[in-house]
């Protein structure tokens, strides 16, 4: 069992000499992801976009709760022949926005997948997480105003969801999604 086996044996025999961890000790997550197997195979890019948008709603919510942003995104797909493929990329600006994560994931998917087979499952993962309080270096050539507006808009939407109901604000695209499994809610808590 290697070094973990040795550590397990030492702990089981009371030979643990590591310092006691404080109760408020918080170990930040290194990645956050969410995936789903759909009720029927995804055959169009629109189906994949809707699925990714749904998945990133959960990821964005968890990033907000943990006060983190993603500096990268990873996409894992499994087709109807159960072949798995995975891609990842860095984001130009770290984000906690579910729509920005969905756009990056979908762009990565579109540029990498050739639609050899319909898709059975999709997983989106926010990677290279950083603190939300960390300053961000902006690029003068990008549309930073639109990026900031999207971040602020989603922050307001999350505040409304926290105050009233998790389903009080839902992207309209998710209201017509047929390919996904039955859920009691579109957002976290209904999984």
Question: Which role does the model predict for each range below?
Answer:
Residues 1-116:
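DNA-contacting surface of Y-family translesion DNA polymerases
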């Amino acid at each position: 069992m290697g070094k973990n086996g040795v550590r397990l044996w030492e702990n089981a025999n009371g030979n643990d000499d590591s310092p006691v961890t404080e109760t408020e000790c918080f170990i930040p997550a290194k990645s956050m992801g969410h995936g789903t197997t759909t009720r029927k195979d995804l055959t169009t890019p629109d189906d994949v976009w809707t699925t990714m948008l749904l998945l990133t709603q959960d990821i964005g919510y968890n990033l907000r709760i943990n006060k983190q942003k993603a500096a990268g995104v990873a996409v894992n797909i499994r087709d109807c022949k159960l072949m798995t493929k995975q891609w990842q990329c860095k984001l130009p600006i770290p984000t906690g926005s579910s729509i920005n994560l969905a756009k990056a994931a979908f762009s990565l998917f579109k540029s990498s997948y050739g639609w050899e087979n319909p898709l059975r499952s999709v997983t989106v993962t926010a990677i290279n997480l950083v603190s939300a309080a960390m300053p961000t270096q902006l690029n003068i050539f990008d549309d930073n105003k639109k990026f900031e507006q999207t971040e602020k808009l989603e922050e307001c939407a999350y505040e409304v969801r926290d105050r009233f109901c998790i389903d009080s604000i839902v992207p309209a695209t998710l209201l017509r999604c047929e390919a996904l499994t039955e859920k009691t809610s579109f957002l976290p808590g209904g999984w």
